């Protein structure tokens, strides 16, 4: 619910501010007077992404330790369904041989899903706790709505793409792929390099921006509903949007995982 001393514009702007650390002075940034510098760190995005990553590890480790060949419990059944789903996706999409791809795909899917799931929390709950209990000037709780997080994950995928390309094709084969495709003639090397370079760089950029754009839009809609409507009428739009958003957060986690598998499969193909 919007604070009584805030206009709707102030309320929306307040919820779109990250809790930032100025890396030059190691002090918290005033969201109303941010410094004109690149050297800031979004502490809230880092904190929640790390916590959710640890939660993923603890959940799966707990199930692995308690796994039984008998009748599984509900939680174990849910985890097994997720693992089976990811394993089937990797089997269908990845055509190379690597023991890394399935664990990587599982980590990406569950981690991104958990980060997206934070969008379903009441919009004012954690920011209110952060402000009134810990004295934080701002707090955003959806890591995947921060372009720094999504592009960082995409950068990790890009490094793996380069690694598998060089591993499977060698430096020479990878260089030929960039310079002799699609036109197999030395005269077209500059053109090929531009085309293939743009194609290669567009993969991580589109991967990160797609997830960020969808989650930022979803977060913004929740903020608009909470900031512009009276509290007693918010549920009329919030409930249907939250139900629809469950599909979106799951789909976006799957798309990020699926594209990662496809890109790594393409990188692993020998020409």
Curated annotation (Swiss-Prot):
Highest taxon of source = Bacteria
Gene3D superfamilies in alphabetical order: ATP synthase, F0 complex, subunit A
User: Which range is the signal sequence, renumbered to this chain?
Assistant: none
Which parts pass through the membrane?
A: 38-58, 100-120, 146-166, 220-240, 242-262
Q: Which GO terms describe its biological process?
A: proton motive force-driven plasma membrane ATP synthesis
Main location class = membrane
Q: Name the membrane topology term.
A: Multi-pass membrane protein
Cellular component GO terms, alphabetically? Answer: plasma membrane; proton-transporting ATP synthase complex
What's the subunit arrangement here?
F-type ATPases have 2 components, CF(1) - the catalytic core - and CF(0) - the membrane proton channel. CF(1) has five subunits: alpha(3), beta(3), gamma(1), delta(1), epsilon(1). CF(0) has three main subunits: a(1), b(2) and c(9-12). The alpha and beta chains form an alternating ring which encloses part of the gamma chain. CF(1) is attached to CF(0) by a central stalk formed by the gamma and epsilon chains, while a peripheral stalk is formed by the delta and b chains.
Q: What's the family? A: Belongs to the ATPase A chain family.
Q: What does this protein do?
A: Key component of the proton channel; it plays a direct role in the translocation of protons across the membrane.
What protein name is recorded for this chain? ATP synthase subunit a
> Species name for this entry?
Citrobacter koseri (strain ATCC BAA-895 / CDC 4225-83 / SGSC4696)
């Amino acid at each position: 619910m919007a604070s009584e001393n805030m206009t709707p514009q102030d309320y929306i702007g307040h919820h779109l501010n990250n809790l930032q650390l100025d890396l030059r002075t190691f002090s918290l940034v005033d969201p109303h007077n941010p410094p004109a510098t690149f050297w800031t760190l979004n502490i809230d995005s880092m904190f929640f992404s790390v916590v959710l990553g640890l939660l993923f590890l603890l959940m799966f480790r707990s199930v692995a330790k308690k796994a039984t060949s008998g009748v599984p419990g509900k939680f174990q059944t849910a985890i097994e369904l997720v693992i089976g789903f990811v394993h089937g996706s990797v089997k269908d999409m990845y055509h190379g041989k690597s023991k890394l791809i399935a664990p990587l795909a599982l980590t990406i899917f569950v981690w991104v899903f958990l980060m997206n799931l934070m969008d379903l929390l009441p919009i004012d709950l954690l920011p209110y706790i952060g402000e009134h209990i810990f004295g934080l000037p701002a707090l955003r709780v959806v890591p995947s709505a921060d372009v720094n997080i999504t592009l960082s994950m995409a950068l990790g995928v890009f490094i793996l793409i380069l690694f598998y390309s060089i591993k499977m094709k060698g430096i020479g084969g990878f260089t030929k792929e960039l310079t002799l495709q699609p036109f197999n003639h030395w005269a077209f090397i500059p053109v090929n390099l531009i085309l293939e370079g743009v194609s290669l760089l567009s993969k991580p950029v589109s991967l990160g921006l797609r997830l960020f754009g969808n989650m930022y839009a979803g977060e913004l809609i929740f903020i608009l509903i909470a900031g512009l409507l009276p509290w007693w009428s918010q549920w009329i739009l919030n409930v249907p949007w939250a139900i629809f958003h469950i599909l979106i957060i799951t789909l976006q986690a799957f798309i990020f995982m699926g594209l990662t598998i496809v890109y790594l499969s393409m990188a692993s193909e020998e020409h």
